[in-house]
From Swiss-Prot:
The lineage of its organism: Eukaryota, Metazoa, Chordata, Craniata, Vertebrata. The modification N6-methyllysine is found at residue 215. This is Craniofacial development protein 1. Pfam families: BCNT. GO terms for biological process: cell adhesion; chromatin remodeling; fibroblast apoptotic process; negative regulation of fibroblast apoptotic process; regulation of cell population proliferation; regulation of cell shape. It comes from Rattus norvegicus (Rat). May play a role during embryogenesis.
Length: 295
């Protein structure tokens, strides 16, 4: 066993050229293998060199082709630019021509329209002028009438009215200052107009010294005078109110009493307020009743 081990360790250098197939190669075979390896390496190197040359030649060709393409594109752009400019010029000329033709057509249409409507417009304008003049005249006359109507009440804003009342067989004269447009002033003017012809009749029927017919006329005139001179009667309340008003005017305490009555403690103001409340309540109840009565 020891000898066998020593032999195995001594042959360790020969293991480098050991082939597992079991056959031994000669030196010629080894040289051929080496040559084949060298040939394979050279072929691979040539292949890589060829690839590099091809790669270098391809961009050059591409550059040449791109240069040609760029030149062709520039030429095409120049040609297209020239053609587009010519087209733009033609379009501009055509647009100007169309605009001028449109303007001419519009002018012709307008002239024909004016010729058709010329006479009618003149007649309409003359009628409008006449209407405007009439309206101006009426408007100028209306303010004058209104001014006259307004000036009349300004001249006689207040009118004094004297009324005669009969209180216990005594004549009581009451004078008031009332607006000219009030109902009292109008009624007073009507009464005075009615009394004027009666006074003329009584003055014309003066009794001469003798005659039966004359007595009759005097009797008739006295009757008319009595009828015309019939006086209104005055109640005690109206007489007391009249006396109170005259007293306030004589003493000059009307404003003081009005200020006092407007205060919180004024009896008249409270009474007026309560009357307004009652009237309002009555109106509300009336509206409710009417709404219920409607179908």
């Amino acid at each position: 066993m020891e000898e066998f081990d020593s032999e195995d360790f001594s042959t360790s250098d020969e293991d480098e050229d050991y082939v597992p197939s079991g056959g031994e190669y000669s030196e010629d075979d080894v040289n051929e293998l080496v040559k084949e390896d060298e040939v394979d390496g050279e072929e691979q190197a040539e292949k890589t060199k060829g690839k590099r040359r091809k790669a270098q030649s391809i961009p050059a060709r591409k550059r040449k082709q791109s240069g040609l393409l760029l030149d062709e594109e520039e030429d095409g752009e120049e040609d297209s630019g020239g053609s587009s400019r010519e087209e733009d010029e033609e379009e501009q000329e055509g647009g100007l021509g169309s605009e001028t033709s449109r303007k001419k057509k519009e002018d012709e249409l307008w002239a024909s329209f004016l010729n058709d409507v010329g006479t009618k417009s003149k007649a309409a304008s003359s009628s409008q002028v006449k209407v405007a003049e009439e309206t101006e005249e009426t408007s100028s006359s209306k303010p004058l009438v209104k001014a006259d109507e307004l000036e009349k009440p300004k001249e006689s804003e207040k009118v004094k009215i004297t009324k005669v009342f009969d209180f216990a067989g005594e004549e009581v004269r009451v004078t008031k200052e009332v607006d000219a447009t009030s109902k009292e002033a109008k009624s007073f003017l009507k009464q005075t107009e009615k009394e004027k012809p009666q006074a003329l009749v009584t003055s014309a029927a003066t009794p001469p010294p003798a005659g039966s017919g004359i007595k009759r006329t005097s009797g008739m005139s006295s009757l008319l005078g009595k009828i015309g001179a019939k006086k209104q009667k005055m109640s005690t309340l109206e007489k007391s109110k009249l006396d109170w008003e005259s007293f306030k005017e004589e003493e000059g305490i009307g404003e003081e009493l009005a200020i006092h009555n407007r205060g919180k403690e004024g009896y008249i103001e409270r009474k007026a307020f309560l009357e307004r409340v009652d009237h309002r309540q009555f109106e509300i109840e009336r509206d409710l009743r009417l709404s219920k009565m409607k179908p």
